[in-house]
């Protein structure tokens, strides 16, 4: 039964999206997990806590005995059934616990007794996590080109279309602004970093990578922050700025934030609740920048948002949203981005409309 030990083995697991049966407790999994992992714990949170307390008070033998007592009979059988099904569904997968210690070895042994030989990660999640951190540090050293531009410039799409592009907002499940949240909850910080590392490793493995194409992001993307090694390199990177006509930007924003988000909410929650969630999403985004807008301006825009939502509900038209979106761009988002760009003006190496920037990036 081959078990993996080397740094290259760990990297290969991440590049291949090897299915990982992670037998740690749910609380550990939520704090940080690998992208291709599924959580089928040997012990639940309460059982793990009880065994941990026993270990501190009575030692390892007593803790092991308690663990076997807690995971016995019908409970053990239910978990065995889940592991067996996962192994059969993922024959190329691998077992993982915190450090490649007792938990993954116990599950491996029980599976062997049931006629299934399944490998485990020697070193466990900790080894994979260290590999992810080291890979990000190493790969961040390659040159970077940032795609900049005001809100609605299509920066994310441009990055997505590059073979050497990494969509940081997609990985973070957030579009980086007050209106940036998606219907998917954001990952824990460690899980986000692991996902980013795996994406960088896979992108690098597919080609002779000369440089990265990334969106010009701030340190925070929603609740996730960029790894410091990557953030530091991004502050030194060249910037290509998309400068599209205002009307084209409005069309993109209408599609992304009104038409698509309304569709996504109603698809997820049904027409009635989906509409309420969509309205709440837009109001929450506007409310998040209330202090910067000032109370009077916020109240004016919030009233225009309500009017636009009423129009959208009754007619299906999203045109009414321009009444609050246009001033929001002209008074808040555009001046803020231009101010930020001025501070790094010496880094700007190209400016043009979307297609021109896309062509320039391909030539690099």
Curated annotation (Swiss-Prot):
Q: Select a single GO molecular function from the record's annotations and give it.
A: transferase activity, transferring alkyl or aryl (other than methyl) groups
Out of the domains of life, which is the source?
A: Bacteria
Q: Which SMART domains match?
A: RHOD
Q: Which residues form the active site?
A: 97 (s-selanylcysteine intermediate)
Q: Which Pfam family, an example, fits this chain? A: Rhodanese
Where would I find the Rhodanese domain in this sequence?
A: 14-137
HAMAP family associated with the record: tRNA_sel_U_synth
Instruction: Spell out the subunit comment.
Output: Monomer.
Instruction: Report the function annotation for this chain.
Output: Involved in the post-transcriptional modification of the uridine at the wobble position (U34) of tRNA(Lys), tRNA(Glu) and tRNA(Gln). Catalyzes the conversion of 2-thiouridine (S2U-RNA) to 2-selenouridine (Se2U-RNA). Acts in a two-step process involving geranylation of 2-thiouridine (S2U) to S-geranyl-2-thiouridine (geS2U) and subsequent selenation of the latter derivative to 2-selenouridine (Se2U) in the tRNA chain.
What's the protein called, per UniProt?
Answer: tRNA 2-selenouridine synthase
Q: What is the lineage of its organism?
A: Bacteria, Pseudomonadati, Pseudomonadota, Gammaproteobacteria, Enterobacterales
**Gene that encodes it:** selU
